[in-house]
Amino acid sequence: MGVIEFLFALAQDMILAAIPAVGFAMVFNVPVRALRWCALLGAIGHGSRMILMTSGLNIEWSTFMASMLVGTIGIQWSRWYLAHPKVFTVAAVIPMFPGISAYTAMISAVKISQLGYSESLMITLLTNFLTASSIVGALSIGLSIPGLWLYRKRPRV
């Protein structure tokens, strides 16, 4: 993939990630003045995950690093705009949730219950379930680490 194609794919990924970020921000009753920042943060998070995955990192570590970036930027923006960091960060990480792998794991579980045990279905179930669980764990831990680092009151040593 050339540089121009990558930049177009990145722009498309960021624009398409901003839409559900705004949608979930509206569901969570985020103030109207913060909606554009939720969209921008969702685009930054998903775009940074795409850049990390393109550079060779797997999806779990890419999601972890992107959610740490979202958490750090959200804390900084909360100081500037006098809002809680969750106003910006929670809606911004929702586009990174593992819908496809969770859905595939669920479908494999349903097929196992209908058709009986099959080694290939069980491998599909476990692989996708572990991937989805790892991504959700990476999102939650990565989103909470910047707050633990930046709001720490005691000395680090």
Curated annotation (Swiss-Prot):
Topology term for the membrane: Multi-pass membrane protein
Transmembrane segments: 8-28, 50-70, 87-107, 129-149
Keyword check for RNA-binding: no
Lineage top rank: taxon: Bacteria
Presence of keyword Transmembrane helix: yes
Gene Ontology CC: plasma membrane
InterPro entries the UniProt entry points to: ThrE_2, ThrE_Dicarb/AminoAcid_Exp, YjjB
Keywords: Cell inner membrane, Cell membrane, Membrane, Transmembrane, Transmembrane helix, Transport
Localization terms from the record: Cell inner membrane
Residue pairs linked by disulfide bridges in the UniProt entry: none
GO BP terms, alphabetized: succinate transport
Predominant location category: membrane
The protein's assembly and partners: The transporter is composed of YjjB and YjjP.
Function, as annotated: Involved in succinate export with YjjP. Both proteins are required for export.
PANTHER family, per database record: SUCCINATE TRANSPORTER SUBUNIT YJJB-RELATED (PTHR34390:SF1), UPF0442 PROTEIN YJJB-RELATED (PTHR34390)
HAMAP family for the chain: YjjB
Family note: Belongs to the ThrE exporter (TC 2.A.79) family.
Protein name: Probable succinate transporter subunit YjjB
Species of provenance: Escherichia coli (strain SE11)
